[in-house]
Amino acid sequence: MKSVRICVAAITAGVVCIAVMLGILSAAIYAENESGDSFIGLMYHQVLKDESRAGKYIITPGELESDLAYLSENGYVSVLPSQLVKIREQGGRLPEKTVVITFDDGYETGLYYVLPLLKEYGMKAVINVVGSYTDEYSRINEEGKHLSYAYLTWNEIKKLSDSGYVEIGNHTYNMHSNNVERNGCARKENESDEQYRTVLYEDVARLSDKLQRVTGKRPVAFAYPFGSLSEGSAEIIGSAGISVFMTCCEQPCSMNRNGRIVINRYNRESGRSAQQI
């Protein structure tokens, strides 16, 4: 298989990451969206009121509101991953101006800042959560948390899922780390095919099983941590019930009518509006 360059976003301290290009994937994985309806994917992370912290992966509620207002006023229709799957299964077509709005990592601000704005502007979004983060913050008393850094609890994820405006995506249970041994859910050096298949499948299935128990809905979407993956990753993740794959590559998307649905996403950093994207 031919190799292509893929976008990798490395996140430091949970919110700061650097987009880099890593040639580790076959052309087939990113060529799967070459025909059909076109759409745009937007990638957000944290939303904070403290303007001094705004940057590459943190925006303010005001910036998010400006984006949603622009999208709404200009006829964009937000579509969820499960809706993409349904449209494909039924042979339907996407709205002329389709956008998929995504939030990675599962910050608690998704409930308190993002959801109210989604409701106000009639938009929908997918929030991709990390299971181990949610476990940790579900054990902490409210007094021990602060909205500026806290992650969603399982109860809060249930509220978001029940809102009708948010779909919950899988961002791995415990592979959201970038260290010398493994970068996200990519294969470790000298890891056998069987070892890699087992560890990746069990991680993804663990979070999907938990989300199904909590929300009553099994996630169809998966976001690669840091955009990092290896040849064979998508097939393994797909065997855990995932059919929509989110990357960090900044390029338009097209609906794949036959294989996997891939959502390439433009990172929305502070100062770079949805209109500019």
What are the language-model segments listed below?
Residues N33-G36, G92-P95, K119-Y121, L160-S163, ...:
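Extracellular/periplasmic catalytic domains that process cell-envelope and extracellular macromolecules
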Residues I58-S72, G106-E108, L147-N155:
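Aromatic- and glycine-enriched glycan-recognition loops and surfaces
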Residues I87, E96-T98, T102, G106-V114:
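Membrane-embedded segments
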